[in-house]
Curated annotation (Swiss-Prot):
Protein name (Swiss-Prot/TrEMBL): Large ribosomal subunit protein bL33m
Taxonomic lineage from the root: Eukaryota, Metazoa, Chordata, Craniata, Vertebrata
Family under the similarity heading: Belongs to the bacterial ribosomal protein bL33 family.
Description of how the protein assembles with itself and partners: Component of the mitochondrial ribosome large subunit (39S) which comprises a 16S rRNA and about 50 distinct proteins.
UniProt-annotated location(s): Mitochondrion
Keyword field: Mitochondrion, Ribonucleoprotein, Ribosomal protein, Transit peptide
GO annotation, biological process: mitochondrial translation
GO cellular component, one term: mitochondrial inner membrane
A single GO molecular function term of this UniProt record: structural constituent of ribosome
Domain of life where this protein originates: Eukaryota
Boundaries of the annotated transit peptide in chain numbering: 1-8
Main location: mitochondrion
């Protein structure tokens, strides 16, 4: 029995890497991974420039994981 080469469509990954930017206006950012199906990410995280926990909001998708 011979196996034929069949091309399959590449499946999408379940997680993506996104860039989160500080809302304190310092320009500090970091990368975080989230589920593809989830809504845009916003969370409290430490900003070392202002030495406080501030709100970080998802700015853009970087890549699929």
């Amino acid at each position: 029995m011979l196996l034929s080469a069949v091309s399959f469509a590449k499946s999408k990954s379940k997680t993506i890497l996104v860039k989160l930017v500080s809302q304190a206006g310092t320009g500090f950012s970091f990368n975080h991974k989230r589920s593809r199906l989830r809504e845009k990410l916003s969370l409290l995280h430490y900003d070392p420039i202002v030495n406080k926990k501030v709100l970080f909001v998802e700015q853009k998708k970087i890549r699929s994981l």
